[in-house]
């Protein structure tokens, strides 16, 4: 990082409670790799510390993507999904690295990625391509267990 600055999320997993929800920031970055990896033991320990609904936040996609973006996945995503599918309080998984908006529910858990404010990728191609006009961000509204995710274009 710049001049040796190393933000805490680079090497740590962190948790914060916000409005009755527990947000776990799971570090999936691995030096010199474009794919991600996480510690199953650390994830399980963090989940078991939570009371109430849980949102997991990580950089690498924990589910298959379209086209060329499958090169950027969470390497041990099967283990990740196995862990969270057996936990009743996991409601939301937010991830990045895709630079486009996705949202789908799998076994009652909402998975979503946000578009990028800098540039967006076209996910439906076999090779890298910028998707002009798709830049934006997501607005996430949570009311109890009701989750609404809206994509906003810039």
Which positions does each model-derived feature cover?
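Extended active-site neighborhood of metal-dependent phosphoesterases/phosphodiesterases
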Residues: 1-45, 76-89, 115, 119, ...
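Short, conserved, surface-exposed binding loops centered on an aromatic residue
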Residues: 48, 84, 103
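Short beta-strand segments
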Residues: 57-59, 94-96, 112-113, 151
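Beta-strand-turn-beta hairpins that frame and shape the catalytic cleft
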Residues: 15-25, 50-55, 105-111, 142-147
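Active-site-proximal segments of metal-dependent phosphoesterases and phosphodiesterases across multiple
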Residues: 52-91, 98
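Conserved beta-strand termini and adjacent loop/short-helix elements that scaffold enzyme active sites
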Residues: 26, 114, 150-154
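A short C-terminal boundary segment appended to hydrolase-like catalytic domains
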Residues: 138-154
